Regions:
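Generic N-terminal amphipathic, Lys/Arg-enriched alpha-helix
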Residues: 1-13
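C-terminal substrate-binding/active-site "lid" region of AdoMet-derived donor-dependent transferases
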Residues: 197
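A polyanion-binding, active-site-adjacent surface
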Residues: 3, 15-163, 167-170, 175, ...
């Protein structure tokens, strides 16, 4: 499995890599890649970390699974490759950004530019079998990404955690709200966006908090 992880993350996550559950997870993921299409491509499994070193993280956006259709997943939650049509949740994210801060909807659904500005675009599960949503859940990725969130919450201060939907909110339930800003709302999925994702103003609120703590705001 051809994966790399950025050095500042490797230093902090090495204790996780050395645990039995992660070795078991690695064996499972290698077997999956050997026997059929799995997304994202192996070299992009840790893309969220490679594009956003530990000390540069300002915002953490928690997703659930990678996209499971060909050509979509690039190792960043909610993001798709250049030229790929926007999935419905991403359409709604861009719609809320436009309504919140007036930024026009971009031509690309790639959120690499967000990652490069300090947004960790973290899926709870980092791989998925083609055409089978949730197929790699319960194999150990959730334990690993819980550790990522805990390390950030404990070692850093004044981060913004964007928790969209009940799954992400459960994932963030141990974060100290006195140390970080937790912004929770329904998920941007068409099934729930009208129940409180639209109008949540999370993008302007994120930037207000970053400015308050002397950090550069995000160019959404």
């Amino acid at each position: 499995m051809n994966v790399q992880i950025e050095e500042s993350w490797r230093q902090r996550l090495q204790p996780e890599f050395d645990k039995d559950y992660f070795r078991t997870l690695t064996d499972f993921v290698r077997s999956e890649y050997a026997h059929g299409p799995v997304y994202p491509p192996g070299r992009l499994i840790f893309n969220a970390f490679n594009l956003c070193p530990f000390d540069q993280v300002k915002v953490v956006l928690i997703g659930q699974d990678p996209y499971h259709e060909p050509g979509q997943a690039q190792g960043l939650c909610f993001s798709v490759n250049e030229g790929v049509p926007f999935p419905p949740s991403l359409v709604n994210i861009f719609k809320e950004i436009k309504n919140d801060i007036g930024t026009d909807v971009p031509t690309s659904g790639s959120l690499v530019r967000w990652a490069q500005q300090g947004i960790l675009l973290l899926n709870a599960t980092l791989t998925v079998r083609a055409h089978q949503a949730g197929s790699h859940q319960g194999r150990g990725w959730e334990t690993f990404t819980d550790a990522v969130i805990r390390i950030l919450a404990d070692e850093r201060e004044h981060l913004v955690f964007l928790l969209w939907g009940a799954y992400a909110q459960r994932k963030g339930n141990f974060i100290d709200p006195n140390r970080h800003l937790l912004l929770a709302s329904p998920h941007p999925s068409p099934l729930s966006a009208s129940r409180g994702f639209f109008g949540n103003k999370h993008f302007s609120r994120t930037n207000e908090y970053l400015r308050l703590h002397g950090k550069q705001p995000i160019v959404w």
